[in-house]
Amino acid sequence: MENQFSLDESTRNAYLNALDIQQWRTRDSHSEDTAEEVDQPQTIVAAKTVRQPKSKTIETVEVEPVVDPIAKIDVDRISRMDLSSLELHVRGCDACALHKTRKQTVFGIGHHKADWLIIGEAPGADEDREGEPFVGRAGQLLTQMLRAIGLAREEVFIANILKCRPPNNRDPKPEEVSACSAYLNRQIQLLEPKIILALGRTAAQSLLQSDVPIGKMRGKLYHLKTNNIPTVVTYHPAYLLRSPKEKRKVWEDLKFARQQIIS
């Protein structure tokens, strides 16, 4: 599948404006470590300390089951599966304890001949419920990010490091990443993307087998050890929702990744 990147300037600007990232186009010369922040005015009023009664907050916490030993993964069998049989196999996976708490697996979705493979970290509550990756607010932001570089969501393939949601949206555990790795590796082999965009620390470090902080991994071109596919690292959309000032850096990463395709 060939990407045309055919958005005209006015359309692209409309998507950037919708994301409140119009400044990305005009601040290219700034270092990633010197992004300007707007100081909000603060009003400090001296007053007597008044102790307020503490309100009781009811918090729901999902209880994780007793962890079973990681089941042996039949890598040889998985390596012979096509995408349809692989997805069916993933649906019945019980290789780690996450199968006890998931609502459903999240295999991935998109164009099977896509040039771009987008890999996130793990499904969240929305994804666990819908069975598709990036369907919540972070997914909406990802869609806008792709549009800004001329890509429709339907033109790429989107997956995660994990196929099941960790309880309470905690970070994936190493043994869970290991249990899912054969599935993801086979997906990559079958999809044969021209480039992989790794979203977030867990995705980047797992794919590239590195413990380097994600901030130091950005802005470089990597190649997967297993199949030499070019890989670019950037921040996860969920992080951008919490830290919108970092959007400019992600815009630079997206342009860098696109350049690898069209050069």
Question: What do the predicted segments below correspond to?
Answer:
Residues E2-S263:
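A polyanion-binding, active-site-adjacent surface
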